[in-house]
From Swiss-Prot:
Residue stretches in coiled coil: none
Signal peptide: 1-32
Chief location category: secreted
EC number(s) per entry: 3.1.1.-
Protein name: Pectin acetylesterase 4
UniProt xrefs under SUPFAM superfamilies: alpha/beta-Hydrolases
Role this protein plays: Hydrolyzes acetyl esters in homogalacturonan regions of pectin. In type I primary cell wall, galacturonic acid residues of pectin can be acetylated at the O-2 and O-3 positions. Decreasing the degree of acetylation of pectin gels in vitro alters their physical properties.
Length: 409
């Protein structure tokens, strides 16, 4: 209102100019806050850990595009010394889209278009180059692959014709194009490699784990770490298959079934094969699971999704576990039990590893990887646990006690 009233004046005084300047600064500041909502969760990093964006040079020839048709990209930090022939790929997360409308909206954000990617991103946690923060992988070649397809790097272009849309469903082609590019940059000679990612990136890690293994030297040590990617296929508190319906719609919309294990797809409804409880049965490559048994993303989107039919107590509890009453905590403990039961078969897998804590969090291998304040189980951080498992220093099958027993959360 201040600026509008001033614009209606023919001549401005010094005080008018001052008010206008203040107004413009406030507007710009408010926009910067709205577009930087994750800054509080990012630790301070050295300038050397700010890594520039590179758009894929292989994407166009492969027909690999983000939802809006822009080129996909990644951030690459070259390895050094003993890590020169070791590679760590991190798949960015960010949910997914199940309808033409939601994918169209997503195409106008950084999760659907490289036009909105940051030109530099901080590498911290599992991507850090600081040995005190990342003791086992700090000097590896480290890559963050940006997520812009809305279907876990697994969509196929056939779906575009089926749905008569101008959107590009090319997640699988994005994955293949960037893999080709990294292989040409030296990854084809890797001695050690690890594929990882969080949330949708953690789910993508499981989907593409064997592809990653199969495209690297046979004598290389190749393993996969899924963070926050073990999504449960359970009914919500109202008895609805919320997460199952979501996966079904994503798989159907973007023809994701073509990227899933075909033996599984032949036996059951394809979207069920996207859930880790099924997909893990068919993965040949060693896998490590990092998950919290009280994953707030799964609670808010799968177990207790926002709904007009939800009573007020659940509306409060779903957003803050500390506000949950005894009856609600019983439901959340039941959710934990469902996870423990689901990973029962994987628990006896000799090559597998796990770090299942009881924090009310989601992504952890960047935010809570290895520091004085990091989450621990049996006094081990996630970084120490993954390192012990990857380098075969010791078996790692860590499952936390129920919430709120872990003081390190």
């Amino acid at each position: 209102m201040v600026i509008r009233s001033l614009l209606q004046c023919r001549t401005w005084s010094k005080s008018d100019w001052l008010l206008a300047s203040i107004g413009i600064v406030l507007i710009v500041y408010s926009f910067s806050l709205s577009f930087n909502s994750t800054s509080d969760s990012i630790p301070s990093v050295d300038r050397s850990d700010l890594v520039k964006l590179k758009l894929s040079s292989k994407a166009k020839e492969r027909g690999a595009f983000c939802l809006d048709g822009s080129l996909p990209g990644y951030h690459f930090h070259k390895g050094s010394g003993s890590g020169s022939n070791s590679w760590l790929l991190y798949l960015e997360g960010g949910g997914g889209c199940r309808t033409i409308e939601s994918c169209s909206a997503r195409a106008m954000t950084r999760l659907g278009s490289s036009n909105f990617f940051e030109h530099e991103v901080p590498f911290f946690g599992v991507l850090s180059s600081d040995p005190s923060q990342n003791p086992d992988f700090f000097n590896w070649n480290r890559v963050m692959i940006r997520y812009c397809d809305g279907a876990c790097f697994s969509g196929h272009p056939e779906a575009e014709f089926k749905n008569e849309t101008r959107l590009f469903f090319r997640g699988q082609l994005i994955w293949e194009a960037i893999m080709d590019e990294l292989l040409s940059m030296g990854m084809s000679h890797a001695k050690r490699a690890m594929l990882t990612g969080c949330s949708a990136g953690g789910l993508s890690t499981l989907i593409h784990c064997d592809y990653f293994r199969d495209h690297l030297p046979k004598d290389a040590t190749v393993k996969c770490v899924s963070d926050g990617g073990y999504i449960l296929n359970v009914l919500d508190v109202l008895g609805n298959p919320t997460m199952g319906s979501f996966f079904h719609d994503v798989v159907t919309l973007q023809s994701v079934d073509k990227s899933l294990d075909q033996n599984c797809v032949a036996k059951m409804e394809p979207s069920k094969c996207m859930f880790p409880q099924e997909s893990l049965k068919n993965i040949r490559t060693p896998v490590f699971l990092v998950n919290t048994a009280y994953d707030y993303w799964q609670i808010q989107n799968g177990l207790v999704p926002d709904s007009p039919d939800l009573d007020e107590r659940w509306k409060i509890c779903r957003l803050n576990i500390q506000e949950c009453d005894a009856a609600q905590m019983k439901v959340l403990h039941g959710f934990r039990s469902s996870l423990i039961d689901a990973i029962g078969e994987f628990h006896v897998n000799k090559e597998g590893g796990m770090f299942i804590n009881s924090c009310n969090s989601h992504c952890q291998i960047r935010e809570s990887w290895h520091s004085a304040t990091s989450t621990r189980i049996e006094n081990k951080t996630i970084a120490e646990s993954v390192g012990d498992w990857y380098f075969n220093r010791k078996p790692v099958k860590l499952i936390d006690c129920p919430y709120p027993c872990n003081a390190s959360c």
